[in-house]
From Swiss-Prot:
Family, as annotated: Belongs to the tachykinin family.
Protein name: Tachykinin-like peptide-II
Modified residues annotated as Pyrrolidone carboxylic acid in this record: Q1
Keywords: Pyrrolidone carboxylic acid, Secreted
Disulfide bridge partners, by residue number: none
Length: 8
C-alpha cells in the first residue's frame, strides 16, 4: 500500500 503524496 503506497500512500499518494498529495499534501497542499
Amino acid at each position: 500500500q503506497k500512500k499518494d503524496k498529495k499534501d497542499k
